[in-house]
Amino acid sequence: MLLIAVVGVRTFSQTSAPTATKSAKVEAGSEACSSCHSEIYKSYSKTVMANASGLAGDGLITGEFNDKTSGVHYRVYKQDDHVWMSYDRESEKFRGQRELSYFIGSGRKGRSYLFSVQGFLFETPINWYSQENRWEMTPAYAEAREIPMNLPAFMDCMNCHSSGLQPPIAGTDNKFSGAPFLHGGITCERCHGAGEGHGASSANSPSVGSSSGNVSTVYSSSGNSSIVNPAKLPADRRDAICMECHFEGTVAVDQPGKHLYQFQPGERLSDYIHYFLLSGNQPETPQALSQVEALSLSECKRRSGDRMWCGSCHDPHAEPAAEEKAAYYRSKCLNCHGEAFATKHHPDKTDCTKCHMPALPSKDVAHTEGTDHRIRRYPNTRPLPQLQVRGTPGAPLVSFPKSDASLATTRDFALAWETLAQRNVEGASQVAEEYLREAVKEQGDDPVLLASLGFVEQKHGHEKEARDLYERVLKLDPLANDAATDLGILEARSGNLRGAVELWQGAFNRVPYRSAVGMNLALAFCVAGQTDVARKFVQRVLEFNPDYFKGKQLQAHLGEKPVQCTP
């Protein structure tokens, strides 16, 4: 039997019980603040953050385009109060459509849309890019010859574009019992904490953000939440509020039992996630979500230390008009550099950012430009310093920020290197194996560690060791889909097709959009002579991924006589 390999890409599904959503409607989460903070509410409601997501029909960007590589024509349109994305390939008389539910992205730089299939949430394969005024394929799929229709909507993306993000149903990554998020855009509470009871308790609440750094100061003694003022928090907790979404790093490792969307203002971000960078990994173009990293490399930040943060230059409640930007940001520069400096330093040029923070092509977001927060002197005569915090043997992986270096555990480094091994970084799998073995000795009941070590062992051809590790994972977490599918591959290779099918069926029932798993089931039943069952699995694959070539080909072969069990 020809297996459609599934080992190599690992995701860790939500296994905790989901919290029920309040409504199938996206609510306006900041309106409750408007009665007391009307001017701030008015200005903030016009910002990019406030409009980062919402219902698909709100501010709908319609249009169409032809993808030359796949030969597919896409169209986004509204009909009878419903928003649709249609697709068709005239050469095959192949066509279909998906109803769009939500948008992601304010439209300032771009926008994508989300749609649901049987409760699973996916991202459209096309994006709108405002700076070039055109539709294009989603990043990484520009050369795709098939429609990538089964792209799961990632929690991290939704977390940084919405508020009130709900946990997915246990055993899945992108299936929700109701609305995936309760509020469109970034609401007041995302930066200021829960506002429930704020009006009644504020007079009796203790001062928020005391210098003690104790998280308990964020909440009143009565149990009601008091509002967090980020500027008054200790520097690490202040910066964490922005860093949650404006820092990407090379690798991010969730802490045990924690997820980034659970983070609350005033808490330590390192309690939820640990970031790593490859030292010296400084591209000439700024990464779309790594403004914090770029700023840390600047002379301004290194000399100012904790006194300088995002709020030193940015007003989170308002955005200056286009004609006011130069003067606005110049005033921020002069807060430190002073008018006397300005009279001597190119007095004829009033836009500091044009030279020192220019817009450059973005590395991670196609067809867009981003502001270079490295605040460099052009032409640059000195190389920027490399980040050196805590290195690892064999490769320059370091913790970020520097204050978190002592908090990084063996588990953190192990999972970081395993992620790099997935990306086929040279030498990463060997370093990952070393760290993972050490981490498993320390925490032998951690299913994430065991699954990661299983992946590395399988990558190195150590199938017996990998099988033992996957079995341990599934005893601890029966909903671990990656361990189940990869163990299924090993069982099939050893001749235990019945055991493989049982493992694959469990995983495919939970995540039916994973085409490779469904195809393996179809092939297994085809080989066993159960072609009717095989057809059902192929049809299930095509429900989520209708342009999947191997699926369409196997579907055709299953209708031939004699039947061919090959994709």
How does the language model describe each region?
Residues 15-16, 24, 31, 39-106, ...:
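Primarily the internal scaffold of c-type cytochrome electron-transfer domains
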Residues 446-448, 481-482, 514-516, 549-550:
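Helix-start (N-cap) detector for alpha-helical repeat units in TPR-like alpha-solenoids
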Residues 442, 476, 509-511, 544:
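Structural marker of alpha-solenoid helical repeat scaffolds
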